[in-house]
């Protein structure tokens, strides 16, 4: 993995501004940074959600994210990227995921960020359990996430 690629899976929260500064520090070749931050919603389908618990397959999750990061780095002219995904119990309003992509121009940064998030939502080995007043339930994959990820497949 190139030195300008950061992939972390962690329980602790992250600071978006600090992560962006780390990606761009000392880099005069960056003209655009696109960020996506996913935040835990407090409701789903009209039901109040107290928290999410995210689990992952250690080692495999990092390797799969790294593989897609390498694809993004080779597919678009990026100068760097960061993917940070939290695991453990996350309450409403807290950060879940951060994707940062840096490039000389915005188009590549936008496309790569969207590609990475589509992959994370559809295929990354994470499992999500919702907690509500009604109890807990595992969240199933959504077909629209699969469709979004499929559009990036080269034929």
Model regions: which residues?
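N-terminal, polar/charged subdomain of small-to-medium soluble alpha/beta proteins
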Residues: 1-96, 110-114, 118-155
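Short glycine-rich or small-residue beta-strand-to-loop segments that form or flank ligand, phosphate
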Residues: 96-103
């Amino acid at each position: 993995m190139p030195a300008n690629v950061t992939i972390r899976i962690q329980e602790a929260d992250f600071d978006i501004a600090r992560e962006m500064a780390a990606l761009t520090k000392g880099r005069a070749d960056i003209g655009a940074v696109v960020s996506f931050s996913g935040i835990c919603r407090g409701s789903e389908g009209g039901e109040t959600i107290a928290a999410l618990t995210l689990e992952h397959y250690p080692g495999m999750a990092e390797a799969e994210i790294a593989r897609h990061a390498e694809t993004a780095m080779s597919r678009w002219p990026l100068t760097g990227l960061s993917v940070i995904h939290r695991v453990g119990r996350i309450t409403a309003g807290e950060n879940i995921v951060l994707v940062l992509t840096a490039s000389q121009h915005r188009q590549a940064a936008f496309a790569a960020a969207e590609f990475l998030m589509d992959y994370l939502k559809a295929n990354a080995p994470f499992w999500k359990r919702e907690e509500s007043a009604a109890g807990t339930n595992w969240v199933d994959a959504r077909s629209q996430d699969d469709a979004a990820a499929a559009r990036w497949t080269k034929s």
